């Protein structure tokens, strides 16, 4: 069993380092890291990690700028990652931070770190403890921000 971690140089923080730190805290599952320039390179990085490096799941770590072109690049990334999942029949967990999703850099940093750490836990659970995720179904979990909880009847 192995987890792939694909990150970018475009990111404003070292998301790969955070992911590895969290993975080491919660699991002894080995990992393979693959760093690429930007988010549009993440689909091929994920595919290589799955097919060439023998990973069972990949976490992609991307940072999206705040322009309209950046948003279009994110759509391309997202479509590419879905195609990789369908081609390989394996999960690719997309962990993306959007430059404009927080009002200041301190909050953006907090959201980014929390989102990375929470998705690393999700990836580990998908591999070794899927029942944990089933128990959380419908509970309003959020990665990066506080959970919102379920809608009560």
Curated annotation (Swiss-Prot):
One of its GO terms (molecular function) is riboflavin synthase activity. It holds the Pfam family DMRL_synthase. Its EC number is 2.5.1.9. It catalyses: 2 6,7-dimethyl-8-(1-D-ribityl)lumazine + H(+) = 5-amino-6-(D-ribitylamino)uracil + riboflavin. GO terms for biological process: riboflavin biosynthetic process. Keywords: Riboflavin biosynthesis, Transferase. Pathway: Cofactor biosynthesis; riboflavin biosynthesis; riboflavin from 2-hydroxy-3-oxobutyl phosphate and 5-amino-6-(D-ribitylamino)uracil: step 2/2. GO terms for cellular component: riboflavin synthase complex. Belongs to the DMRL synthase family. NCBIfam families: ribC_arch. This is Riboflavin synthase. It comes from Archaeoglobus fulgidus (strain ATCC 49558 / DSM 4304 / JCM 9628 / NBRC 100126 / VC-16). The lineage of its organism: Archaea, Methanobacteriati, Methanobacteriota, Archaeoglobi, Archaeoglobales.
């Amino acid at each position: 069993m192995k987890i792939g971690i694909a990150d970018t140089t475009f990111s404003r923080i070292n998301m790969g380092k955070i992911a590895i730190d969290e993975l080491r805290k919660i699991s002894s599952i080995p990992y393979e890291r693959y760093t690429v320039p930007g988010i549009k390179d993440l689909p091929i990085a994920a595919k290589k990690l799955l097919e060439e490096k023998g990973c069972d799941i990949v976490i992609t770590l991307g940072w999206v700028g705040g322009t309209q072109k950046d948003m279009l690049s994110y759509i391309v990334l997202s479509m590419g990652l879905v195609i990789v999942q369908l081609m390989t029949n394996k999960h690719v967990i997309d962990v993306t931070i959007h430059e404009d999703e927080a009002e200041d850099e301190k909050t953006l940093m907090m959201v980014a770190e929390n989102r990375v750490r929470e998705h690393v836990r999700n990836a580990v659970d998908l591999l070794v403890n899927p029942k944990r995720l089933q128990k959380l179904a419908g509970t309003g979990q959020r990665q990066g921000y506080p959970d919102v909880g379920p809608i009560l009847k």
